[in-house]
Amino acid sequence: MDNLKINRQMIRNPLHNSGAVAVSFVILFTSMLNRRHLRIKILHVLYAFYQDEERDVVKTKKALDHSIEKMQELYLLLLLMIGSMQSFAIDRIEAGRKKQLPSPEDLHPNTKFVTNRPLRVLANSKNLSEAAADGNIGWGNHQEMLRKIFRGLLDHEEYTTYMASEERGFRHDRECLIRMFRKHMINEELFQDNLEELSIYWNDDLDLAASMAIKTIKTIGEADEDVELLPLWRDDDDDRQFFEGLFKETLAQATENESYVTEAAANWDLERIALMDRILMKMALAEARTFSSIPLKVTLNEYIELSKYYSTPKSHGFINGILDELFGKLKKDGVIKKTGRGLIE
């Protein structure tokens, strides 16, 4: 990936300022990856590809596959981070008891956090430790960062409220742990700064990976002694085929789809059309032409949404107009063909 340099701020959002990003959570899935995220992954590497003089397809595909692997690594690291908080809490309690002049609080500590049941499941998870070992994944030299995150947690409202509450119960433990993770751990500026240094992919992956970590915690039942990890892909191959096919066909159809865009945008100054917009439209056309079971409206809406986040403020209107015109024309000409219930007119 050394020669496929990605402008991280442009890819994340060319209009957003840098700095810690508050993570939001709106998506829950039965696997880690979803099609919108796959589209974004492909968009990232194609943006780098078209900026690179070599335009090496093989190298670009390797970078794409690597970014998917890094997504899974981040998911596991987040779960490991949550589990590590118990170890720091235990160390703190033991250190307090060993003081020469321990306070009553040191001698009789509040153990509500260290006995939080979902936290204990994560901290002692065989499935998680084996998956991490198999991928050689761990926080390694970043223990001090985790320790500082734990220290910050001690003063966070979610933690102090939880510890002061007399409420008990598995559901209470689980909900409070999720809030501590969501509101403090991953939104800690130190964590986000380190994340950017560890991998160029992870700031864009954090939202989804954190959603997957929360989904995993929510699956922990009261009687569970271990956690079931989410698979990277669903059991069926539909999403994997979509991923492979969209990347391949966007490049294979690039020249032809570029000509369609050029024709439809005849009244526009083509040199002023942003590279990001051109890539989005070529991806959308490749998707519409290749995947007969995906409704055109779905494809259109997906790329309009991506343009709102990754391109200029006016791009979504431009892309909407061009794609709407081209989809209608190419469907009429038989270039775009749809099959399945509700897709054949």
PLM regions and their residue ranges:
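Generic detector of intrinsically disordered, low-complexity, polar/charged segments
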Residues: 16-19, 318
